[in-house]
């Protein structure tokens, strides 16, 4: 009888553990689905089609149109605004964190939704002025039309341009305010503009060229002098020989 009770308790315990594991797997799957479908940013893709689609902007809590290239997208890609809202309406930046806390009672290692990059975020990283603020605007090979801003070091201001959606650089900002916050007055040392760099490079090239020409002239002068010295030695040696022959003739 005691063995039967222990067997039943063991089965009940196994059933409870299996139920908890299944519940945890379902919650984790739901978190991942919400993150991939609503939490990530839009991806235009590398292809060059122009397909109108919708994506959920978790920061604004709204569905917004974009142009999809046709390949290598992600789950945050919907054919209509209604489909986007049905899937993601009400999802916020803290949704996945709240779900993780409810499951574990504390912060978990589930991927968090990326937030907008601010000036404080960049200051916490190793800020590379020449990487984030110096390069010229790059539209890229893709054919989307995203309004962006880049920092012009020669004008010390942010200028708007159209970003194609792929293969850009880090000097590309969503707003003029973000661009100015990141780059205006942030250089940590006297900065050389591209024009000044070109002048310096040309000057260095001319200095090296003059140095090489001067060295060549010195070597040429030395060679000429050596030849002249050898020629003079040859002349004097011939005259001495003639004089010695005359003396020998007189003696005979």
UniProtKB/Swiss-Prot annotation:
The record marks 48-49, 143-144 as: Reactive bond. Isoform 2 is more predominantly expressed than isoform 1. SMART domains: KU. Interacts with TMPRSS13; the interaction promotes the phosphorylation and cell membrane localization of TMPRSS13. The chain crosses the membrane at residues 198-218. Inhibitor of HGFAC. Also inhibits plasmin, and plasma and tissue kallikrein. Inhibits serine protease activity of TMPRSS13. Inhibits serine protease activity of ST14/matriptase in vitro. Keywords: Cell membrane, Cytoplasm, Disulfide bond, Glycoprotein, Membrane, Protease inhibitor, Repeat, Serine protease inhibitor, Signal, Transmembrane, Transmembrane helix. GO terms for molecular function: serine-type endopeptidase inhibitor activity. Pfam families: Kunitz_BPTI. Residues 38-88, 133-183 form the BPTI/Kunitz inhibitor domain. This is Kunitz-type protease inhibitor 2. GO terms for cellular component: Golgi apparatus; plasma membrane. It is found in: Cell membrane; Cytoplasm. It is a single-pass type I membrane protein. Residues 1-27 form the signal peptide. Residues 219-252 are cytoplasmic. This inhibitor contains two inhibitory domains. Residues 28-197 are extracellular. Disulfide bonds join 38-88, 47-71, 63-84, 133-183, 142-166, 158-179. Its main location: membrane. Glycans are attached at residues 57, 94.
